[in-house]
Design a protein with these regions (language model features):
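Hydrophobic faces of well-ordered beta-strands that scaffold small-molecule active sites
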Residues: 3-8, 35-39, 66-71, 105-107, ...
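Conserved, mostly hydrophobic/aromatic
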Residues: 5, 28, 59, 97, ...
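Active-site-proximal loop/turn and secondary-structure-junction residues that shape catalytic pockets
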Residues: 9-11, 41-43, 72-75, 109-113, ...
Length: 261
């Protein structure tokens, strides 16, 4: 397994303008010492080719893999014009990911406006369309399970979306902290993961996440032959400067430990 870091870990620093994308890359390489980074649409100051080329070159020079780009899309609105604009947005970020050499784009199913059953067919069609586009670009889409009234709050929801879309370019991106029923759905879907977001809502003194059994998760992924990326994701209230290094060190110890420890 390979350890990466999501730029959203530093949302507060980005919002305060004390960190930009280049600074994030440098921090990941020299201070956090992770192998890869996951970027998000909300942190790009621009997407002109010259900027993307420079960003990709910076990551390469620092020895970092850009493992994915996250887009904040929503295919749950009733209005056709809204969905079409969201489809166009996802396609744009697929092109950005391709320019950066990233193999994956994180997507959401979205939040249904009204009954989910009424919005479901259009959401499935939208995901299938962007999956087709990603496939033509040679990329994969990672569908992240999400809460807060989203389509994919439980394992049943996530599995149904993946089955209904039924596209080889759309895979399960497991977010360990987003299922409304917690571990039960994590355990049911971990075997399908093409990518993992290791969420930290809290950080204990030893760096562990009190609400998520990461030793059990890492052991389960290892038994199932998972050798892909685990992207660290920090959303705890504790300051980024203290919470992130402690939590990341804990996660690294679990990943680096010999099997059976």
């Amino acid at each position: 397994m390979k350890l990466g870091c999501i730029c959203g870990c530093f949302n507060r620093a980005f919002d305060a303008r004390t960190m930009d994308q280049r600074g994030f890359l440098e921090h990941c390489a020299t201070t956090l010492r992770v192998q890869g980074v996951e970027l998000q649409d909300i942190h790009f100051p621009q997407t002109r080719p010259v900027y993307l080329q420079a960003l990709r070159r910076t990551a390469t020079d620092l020895g970092l893999a850009i493992v994915g780009v996250g887009v904040h899309n929503d295919f749950g609105r009733a209005a056709t014009t809204w969905r079409q604009s969201e489809i166009a947005k996802v396609k744009q970020w697929i092109e950005v990911a391709e320019a950066l050499g990233a193999p994956q784009v994180r997507v959401f199913a979205g939040h249904p406006e009204g009954p989910a059953s009424e919005r479901w067919p259009a959401m499935i069609a939208a995901l299938r369309e962007v999956a087709d586009f990603a496939a033509r670009a040679g990329l994969r889409l990672g569908l992240e399970n999400h809460n807060h009234g989203a389509f994919t709050r439980t394992a049943d929801d996530q599995l149904r979306v993946l089955e209904d879309v039924n596209h080889p370019a759309l895979g399960h991106l497991l977010d360990t902290g987003n299922y409304t029923d917690g571990w039960a759905s994590v355990e049911r879907t971990a075997h399908l993961a093409v990518h993992v977001h290791a969420k930290f809502w809290q950080v204990a003194p030893d760096g562990s996440e009190p609400t998520i059994d990461y030793p059990k998760l890492i052991a389960m992924l290892r038994r199932r032959g998972y050798e892909k990326w685990i992207s660290f994701e920090y959303e705890a209230a504790e300051a980024e400067a203290t919470g992130i290094p402690r939590a990341l060190a804990y996660l690294r110890r679990l990943i680096d430990a010999p099997p059976g420890d």
